[in-house]
């Protein structure tokens, strides 16, 4: 009997070990690509639209322009409809024993980098002084993450818990990017329905891919009045910091010991669902999904 239970216990241990291996978070792999996860929830859809790599982006953009024009003519306030919160989809850029670095798959909203060109020119080398950094670590974080989820997030080198990627990261082959001009397209990102119809994110024409320009967390090295951004080809360029239609593609770091995988297979269509766990009990905490 003892031997039988020992064999059963061994089998269970092997099963759990295999399950953990299958659910292991890792960074980009040249052969296997990215691991995808969901964590937190944010306004993304209105009429149930999904980004679909820009298939609907141009339609949302033209629809919003038409509706805004009609509202202005009728002297009414533009009303795109009620936005719905959906799980935020992230790429796992890198993962080790200290942190899991996540980059939003989509542009989640549009915003100025900073409202004062003079202030940005003088202090823009410090991303934390910008209006956008304050929005990411204030309004956005409060809307997107529960207290338990925020507790699982790490502060990145004085940037706060929510930040933007920089050019070094978006040129790093270890994270799936490249410095080669022919690979600029890898940096393209598409905006959500909410980002386009509600916050006014710009959409490049269909011939260019229907994607959206988005900010990096850096000041331009050639014109300090401007911020670095991703342009129509996916190249790293610069734009005036008061541009209201440039997108934000948030990034976060998570504590590996403060999260757990609950479902999914890690693909873009079936991402792992990450949930925060209690330090005391090791059990899942309340998430934004449960608070909805």
Report residues per predicted region:
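Bacterial N-terminal signal peptides
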Residues: 8-17
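Collagenous Gly-X-Y triple-helix signature in extracellular proteins
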Residues: 22-292
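Bacterial Sec-dependent signal peptides at the C-terminal "C-region" and cleavage site
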Residues: 3, 16-24
């Amino acid at each position: 009997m003892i031997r039988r239970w020992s064999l059963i216990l061994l089998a269970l241990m092997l099963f759990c070990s295999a399950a953990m291996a299958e659910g292991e978070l890792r960074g980009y792999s040249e052969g296997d690509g990215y691991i995808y996860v969901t964590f937190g929830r944010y306004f993304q859809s209105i009429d149930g639209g999904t980004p679909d790599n820009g298939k609907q982006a141009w339609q949302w953009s033209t629809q919003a322009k038409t509706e805004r024009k009609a509202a202005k003519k009728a002297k009414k306030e533009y009303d795109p409809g009620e936005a719905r919160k959906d799980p935020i989809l992230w790429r796992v850029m890198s993962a080790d024993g200290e942190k899991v670095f996540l980059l939003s798959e989509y542009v989640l909203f549009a915003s100025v980098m900073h409202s004062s060109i003079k202030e940005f020119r003088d202090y823009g080398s410090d991303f934390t002084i910008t209006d956008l950094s304050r929005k990411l670590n204030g309004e956005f974080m409060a809307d997107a993450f529960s207290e338990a989820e925020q507790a699982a997030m790490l502060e990145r080198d004085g940037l706060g818990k929510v930040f933007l990627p920089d050019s070094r990261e978006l040129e790093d082959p270890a994270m799936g990017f490249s410095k080669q001009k022919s690979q600029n397209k890898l940096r393209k990102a598409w905006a959500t329905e909410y980002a386009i119809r509600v916050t006014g994110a710009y959409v490049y024409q269909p011939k260019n891919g229907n994607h959206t320009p988005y900010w990096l967390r850096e000041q331009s090295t050639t014109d300090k009045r401007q911020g670095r951004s991703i342009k129509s080809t996916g190249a790293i360029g610069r734009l005036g910091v008061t541009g209201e239609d440039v997108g934000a593609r948030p990034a976060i770091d998570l504590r590996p010991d403060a999260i757990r995988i609950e479902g999914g297979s890690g693909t873009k269509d079936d991402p792992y669902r990450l949930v925060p766990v209690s330090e005391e009990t090791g059990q899942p905490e309340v998430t934004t999904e449960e608070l909805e």
